[in-house]
């Protein structure tokens, strides 16, 4: 009986031990769509919304695009000022689980950079003024993580220069 228990224990241990080498939440060929909101707008008003899409081109690198939108207005006695901001561009990420030895198939950590165009327009209805001041080429950088609740649905959080805020959170869909 003792021999049977020992053999059963060893078989159970062998069956639950992973021989894959490294379990990972991100891999080559993954398609990731993030949709979220900015939690801290650079402009102090409005709620930045944005989306990014990336494709895994290697086991650790993804490339794709990003778009962000924000608008807001300020008003008071004698003035009414508003703005609209739009960002679109490319982005790339390096996925860090293997670097940091994170062996979790639900967690994906990454850092990345982006390059795009930012359009910023403001108007002052009180004085009939307006401008596109602040528009032009825009460089962004970020660190982030996503946790997959299921194979195709998760949540993400990014910190850094992430469009129009320095904190972005939302939903991730994996295809």
Protein language model regions, located:
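Cleavable N-terminal export/targeting peptides
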Residues: 1-29
